[in-house]
Each structure stands twice: as C-alpha cells, then as structure tokens.
From Swiss-Prot:
UniProt cross-references to CDD domains, sorted A to Z: ABC_MutS1
Gene Ontology MF terms in the entry: ATP binding; ATP-dependent DNA damage sensor activity; damaged DNA binding; mismatched DNA binding
SUPFAM superfamilies hit by this protein: DNA repair protein MutS, domain I, DNA repair protein MutS, domain II, DNA repair protein MutS, domain III, P-loop containing nucleoside triphosphate hydrolases
Protein name: DNA mismatch repair protein MutS
Organism: Zymomonas mobilis subsp. mobilis (strain ATCC 31821 / ZM4 / CP4)
Amino acid sequence: MMEQYYELKAQAQDCLLFYRMGDFFELFFDDAKKASAILDIALTSRGTHIEESIPMCGVPIHAAESYLARLIKAGCRVAIADQVETPAEAKKRGGSKALVKRAIIRVVTAGTLTEEALLDSRAANWLVAVARAGSDFGLAAADISTGRFETIALSEGRLDSELARLSAAEVIAPESLVQQEAYKNRIPQAVELSNECFNSPHGEARLKSIFKISTLDGFGIFSRAELAAIDGLLAWLDRAGQGKLPFLQQPVRRAYADHMLIDAATRSSLELTASTEGRRDGSLVSSIDHTVTGAGARLLTADLGAPLMDIDVIHKRLDLVEFFFYDTLLREDVRDLLKGSPDLARVLGRLVAGRGTPRDLSLLRDGLNQAFILYEKLFSLEHKPALLEQILPDFRGHGSLVDLLERALIEQPPIDATQGGFIAKGYDHALDELRSMGGESRRAIAALEATYREKTGINTLKIRHNNVLGYHIEVPSRHADALMQANSGFTHRQTLAGVVRFNASELHEQAIRATQAGVQAIAIESKHLACLIESTLEKRDNIAACADALARLDVSAGFADCAVQKNWTRPTVDDSCCFDVIQGRHPVVENALVKSGERFVANNTNLDPKNRLWLVTGPNMGGKSTFLRQNALLAVLAQTGSFVPAEKARIGLVDRLFSRVGASDNLARGRSTFMVEMVETAAILSQATNRSFVILDEVGRGTSTYDGLAIAWAVVEAVHDINACRCLFATHYHELTQLTSRLPALSLHHVRAKEWQGDLVLLHEMAEGAADRSYGIEVARLAGLPPVVLKRASEVLAQLENSSGKNNDSSANLSDLPLFGVQAFQTVLPQNNPLYDAVSELDADALTPRQALDIIYRLKELAAKDKVM
C-alpha cells in the first residue's frame, strides 16, 4: 500500500495528499504533521519507514469539506487520491490480496473551489494568471464556481490596480517573473508555474478547442500577453481537474476605456470592498449592500470595483433603479421572489465540474421556475426601462428543462445520490416495479419477525440489518441455545456480548430479493441522474445568462431599497467636468452614525473648470478627510449606477480616481510612510487627466516642515497647471493659502470649529475661506494628552508665533525656551503645592505595602482638592 502512496505523493508534488482508506482520507509523514497542527486533530502512527514510525492522521470522508476549507484557508493545496475501483473489482482483477486502485482525481486549491461549503456565497472566487510578453502584461481571470472568464491587456504600471480590483483567491505566474526582485512583492504568494505553461500560440489553440471554434475573432483581438495568461490559467485548471476543465463562459475582454481607473492605493484608502482591517464590514460595499442573493452581492462588488465610463449604460442602470425606487410594492414583490432564488451560477458550476448532486438539479429546477414567475410579473408592466427589457428574455425559455426536472425528481431530493430515492414515482415504470419488489420483500421480512417469534416463543427476537451481515435475526444470549440446534431451521452467524445473531433460509431469500431490487434501482437512478445532468448542461449558456440577469435585477432592486431607506437621490451623470453636490454625505460614516443615533452633517461641493481645485484647511478631527473621501465615493456610486447620499448631485464623468489619504508604510517593499506618500503622489501627478478626480490629504507631512511645505506647494501648482483635474486638497500648511492670488482655479475652504467656554467644538461644516488656526493643541486636549504636555506645547507655540510675527529666526528664539525637564515641570507644578510637597517627602525604599496604600489614598485626596494632575 505504501508503494502506491509514494507514487501518488510524487504526483501530488507540493500538495497535501488525501489518501482514501475506507471511510477516511488519511495523511502520512510531513503531510500528517502539517495537517494535524492546522486542523487540531490527533497525530498517530502506522507502521514504520526506515525503522521509524510513520506519522499519520485522518479525516472522515463525510466531513471532508469542512476540513478542506480550513486547510485551504491556511494556504494549503490538497490532492485527493480516491479509490477508482471497488474492493470486489480489485479481487476480481488480482485475487483476494489485490490492492484497490487509487488515483488523484482532483487538486483542491484556493482558486479552484466549487463546493458550496468551501465558498463565501457573497464573494467571487477569482483565479488569476499573470503573463508578460515583451513590455506588455496580460491577465486572465476565472471564477470557476460561476464560469465567469475575463482577460485584460495592460501595462506594467496598471498591474497592481487590476490585481487589487480582482482581489484574487489565487494567483499563478511564470517562474521567471515571480523570481524577479521587482515582482516578488507585487505578486504576493503567487504560484510559480514553468515558463512553458505560458505560451501564446498554445493559449490560442486551447481557447479554440474549448469553445469549438476556428477563429477567435468573435471574442475580440487578444494580445500575446493575454493569450499567454490564458494558457497558464487553463494549464492550472487542467491540473486541478486532472484533465477535466470546469465550466467557463466565453471570455470577456476588458478595456480600460470602459471603466474608471482606480489604483490599488485608492481602493485601499477608500475601503471600497474591504476595510483597512481586510474585512467586508466597514467597507462601502457592506454599507450599501441591500441585495438578497449571493449572486447579487457578488455582482455588486464587481460593479463597485469597475465603475462605468459609458454614460448610456450608466443611465440605463439608473433608470432601472429609479423604476424600483418609485414602485414600492413591485420592489418588495421582486425582492421577495429573489430571496427564494437559488444560486444558479454556482449550481451550474458544480454540475459542470462533475460534483453535482440530485439536490443541485432540484435547485436549478426551482431557480428557473422562480425566474419565469419574475418574467410573468415584469413582462406585462408598461413603460419598462431599457435595461429591464434587455434582461427579461433571459428569464424564460427554460420550460422544457424545468418540465423534465419536475417529472424526474422528487420535491426535496437528497444530496447523496448513492442511496437512491431521488427519482419521482411514475418517471420510470421499471424503476417503480423494482421499488415495489423491494418494498414487498421488506414487508415480508417484517412479517417474518412475527412468524419467528411465534415459532421460537422468544418475544424479544428481532430482525435487524447492517452493512456487514445484511438482514439477520438477533436474540438475547439466554435464548440462543434453542436456535443452535441442528433442526431449529436457524444458522448461527455471530456471537456478541449479550446477543447472538442467526440467519434463516426464508429470511435469506427475501433479503436477496430486497437487496437485488435495491441495487438495480440505484443503478437505474444513477443512469437517470447522469442523463438529467447531461440534458441540463446542454442548456448551460442559457442558464448562465439567466443567472446573470437575476443578479442584475437583484443589484438594481437593492440599490433602490437602499436609496429609499437612506434618502438618497438620483445623480445626473454627464460628460462635463463639473462636480456639483448639494448636501452630500459619506455613505459609510453616515451608516455608522445612524446606528448610534447620531446625525451626519452634510456639505456642499461645487467644482467646475473655473473652480476645480479646493484647498481645504481646518482642525484635525474636523472632518476634512471624511469630506474628501465622501466626494470620491459619490463619484464611484454614480458611475456604478447607484443613487447617491445627497439632496442633488451632478457629476461629470470621472476617468480616473486617485486618493492620497492616510498614513501607511510598506516595510515589505522597503518603503517608509513618507516614501509611500511620495510614490502615490507621483503616480497621481503622472497619470491624472483633466477628467480625473483627485483627493489629497496632508501631502508633505511626513518630512521636515519646510521640505513638506515646499513639496505641498509644488504639488498644488502641478495639479492646477499641468493636470488641470478636479481636486480636493486638505492641508495644515496655511502658507498655501497665498496661492489663490496666483492660481485662478483654486479656492479656499475650511471645516468650521469654534471655542465655547474653553472647549473646542467641531462643527464638521464646510465654509468658504481659510481657517484662522489649526486648533492642534485643543484637539490634543480632546485626545487626553497630559496637562503638563499641553502647557509646554502652548509655550512653544506662543514663542513660534511670536517669532514668526517678528519675521525673526525661530530657531534662535526657541533656544531661549527652558528644556522640557524639571524646570518646565515646575512651571506647571510649583514647589509650594501640597501634592508636590507630599511626593517630595516620600522615601519609596522604606515604605511597607500598607504604608504605600495609605499614601496613595492621601495623594488622591490632595489631587481632588488641587486639580493639577
């Protein structure tokens, strides 16, 4: 057996090997050690190898999916070695000692999952292949759980943004690329494949073969890099399926001109689909997700990741949202019907992958039925939006398949097909007869129990069944002697503690009839299952289109529901360079405030070609960063086809969105906080066009004051004069306000704050003009800095402001300030203070624990009287 294991393990390469033994998948050697640690299961041993025990652990087959999920989450890949013949077939082939044949039937990786238990129903599961041809790059991406398949040709500079958009579960790349220092951290944890797996001509040939076409012209013109990426992707899928490819829809070629460009840094800072902690909660998608199906949630995430550039398509989406927005009853009816709709795309994915079950077929039947009910409800409506007219035909045309599945399957089929019982009565008369025969035999067996009790006088006699003995008679040990007699008519089979088991000729005959009928019935049902799956897969493209249409309907109705509940409005999206928002709100922050019973302070934004750059000043915590992000998110929502949180909004098409907000570092790539800031700012200045929207927060703060001011000054000028884009620029450098005299499209704005009875009140309101001060020390007081530090800061600030007013050398004046030591401390805590005196008199080394406790209480009383600390 171990020889067979070694052979299979060699094929598995870097994967853990699940080796089937009976009802368990066993792991050996280092695989066992690694798996037992991850799964927290017992590590045992079996036999020896080179005079050492072989480590072993195992998981039951019926629970294998849950264990697989944990291993995949831990970053493992698992090869499944299953039995490919029965023990009976093995004996027939090689005698009683023949080893059952096993083979690797599948390799399970993070990007090749199809099982419902292993996937997040509300998130896509992308497998991405990266390839390079010359200076060009290509990506090929597939979600095999739904069949989605897309490619994109891109430059090296856009690689990070596309990988960030897809948020792939698994990335594969040529070994020559991954091993280059420049890409090790840009393609993290990529699976290395040999360079031969990324061959452009071979990729083209594979595509033609899969879709049975002679030319790719109907799909578009693929670049060499795209075809190489396709080849790598299909090679990995071929390995994972051991020669069986999953369902893939026709590849969709993405073009940058079709979607708003959002780089990786901007996606992260705006938290579009994941918070800074990497969770869905707290992100934009989580705050606006009112979808009721997993497919709808996945499409919503995809839409937010790629806002549209086609105004006509944006308007079509907005029209459908508005249609549901104003018809409450229709919206609620549609959403109720969608709630009961199965995930057709993932059901189809399992069927194509060969892992479909009778339950999956019933889900498909019910889902297509729901689609037709929706069709009937929506088709008769007047003044339907164009997008609804476009997707409605995909809801119908499945009648023959639904009729077949309704006739063939019972209402609630089991997941496990091996025990039969899922084909409906009346679908196959021969099957019905076998079931009848089996039923008669089982009834006869039940009657035999009463007969044997009467014959033997043993009232506790029972007829039982198990997988080893089949049907048998069981009596308590004290009654066994009578049945042991040669003329009793019973044959001894097994003796256990407390019971003895027997057989009888009549029981044996009936058992054979029941077993044969059952085996034949299961065989017939298995054939029917295969035929039903084959008939279903003939309609795979139509089913996939229906699934996509249901998801689009769910997203649109969900947008409408969100807009109604949160008082959002339809934006006007046009080809101008305006950005005019009345009473706009931050969708995520407002959502959090509403939950805590607070109100979000709305603000206006008005950018146009003559007033396209706002310089925003004001205190920390005043809401500058929130205001910046809020407007960026409004652009994303509008071009996604959603209503927006505002009273009114007109948004000129944004081709590229950039955000330089928040401080972070990238130690893995050797970059400090300031270096990251400069790299991101450089990307903005080199890529932003006059149609872009840019938010910049505190540029230059990561270095010395004068260096930072100089950089910020130059960046403002470049954004104004060279990029000429719409930009919100938040800063604490008040010197930048002088630029209004030189830059005609720049205007000054600030977030309002006021002092009330010695406290700082942050109003979170935008107003014209520059802030008169930054209120930094007041914010520090709100944050809880010690009074002694605040006092010292006030002294330093006063000296700096005084020297600035006199236009003197501030460094010379600062040298006159006392050091932040005893002298500075005494300016806050004079020596004649009782608390100071009490502390000075202490001899800490001579105190007992009791004395120390008494002194603590005394000091607390003194502090209460004289609120110094």
